[in-house]
Amino acid sequence: MAVYTDIAEDDLKWFLTEYDAGTLLSYKGIAEGVENSNFLLHTSKDPLILTLYEKRVEKTDLPFFLGLMQHLSARGLSCPLPLPRRDGALLGSLSGRPAALISFLEGMWLRKPEAKHCREVGRALAEMHVAGDGFELKRPNALSIDGWQTLWEKSEARAGEVEAGLQDEIRGELDFLAAAWPKNLPAGIIHADLFPDNVFFLGDALSGLIDFYFACNDLLAYDVSICLNAWCFEKDGAYNITKGTAMLEGYQSVRPLSGEEIAALPVLSRGSALRFFLTRLYDWLTTPEGAMVTKKDPLEYLRKLRFHRQIKSPAEYGLSL
């Protein structure tokens, strides 16, 4: 979450009249994240999240995102729900941006997740994959192989500002992944961004998943690899196999991975590491000064990518083969 667009209090109060949301008491921007402008609203009824969708989010994708949250919630997954307007629409407009009100989910994200939390995340990810079955809208993954190439082309000329010699390494990685990427693994709805700040806990109990604005149709095991990258590395860059084992056991307690999915994990993990390296690199080079947004270090994911290149067997992630 982040704030790129400011809102005037009078405009917000007028916006809220289109909803059965109560009277505005207070609001504040939320700085975490990089995609949209988000605000926490306190009203005379319930707290709400107001999201203004910025230019990177295609307006035509919003029915998919908002409808998916409704679909998953109806199937028992704990996630935010969009609040309909009085006319039944899920989407409004505020400060020149498409805007939606989303229910507030109780809980906090973990700054120092442990293996027991990784197990819960693995289980919740699998539950989301199962619950997503039957959702009729489709959204291709814009941040897969073709999207990575486009991002790299936008960043390549300045990549040396982050680390010398990146051009040859990343071009080689893109070529490898284009040739090695699996094509016939189980696919469905994936979250595609299930980082610690998108998972809420109350104590040690997982209370819900948030931020579905990268969700799309893609390989389910690719989503697993994203979580391995996001949850199972320590601050010093070391892979924590105890966390990896817990994550994978939690996932497979709900949806066992096929042999083909397990064999593909090293390639998928290289791909997901490259994906987040490239988006972080692009944001690092292009985010305007003064934006209320937390920029993230792209080199963290370059180090993870280099780790995955050294993997000889999926067992090194903590799988029992």
UniProtKB/Swiss-Prot annotation:
It catalyses: L-homoserine + ATP = O-phospho-L-homoserine + ADP + H(+). Gene3D superfamilies: 3.90.1200.10, Phosphorylase Kinase, domain 1 (3.30.200.20). This is Homoserine kinase. Pathway: Amino-acid biosynthesis; L-threonine biosynthesis; L-threonine from L-aspartate: step 4/5. GO terms for molecular function: ATP binding; homoserine kinase activity. NCBIfam families: PRK05231.1, thrB_alt. Belongs to the pseudomonas-type ThrB family. Keywords: Amino-acid biosynthesis, ATP-binding, Kinase, Nucleotide-binding, Threonine biosynthesis, Transferase. Pfam families: APH (PF01636). GO terms for biological process: threonine biosynthetic process. Its EC number is 2.7.1.39. SUPFAM superfamilies: Protein kinase-like (PK-like) (SSF56112). InterPro entries: Aminoglycoside_PTrfase, Homoserine_kinase_II, Kinase-like_dom_sf, Pseudomonas-type_ThrB.
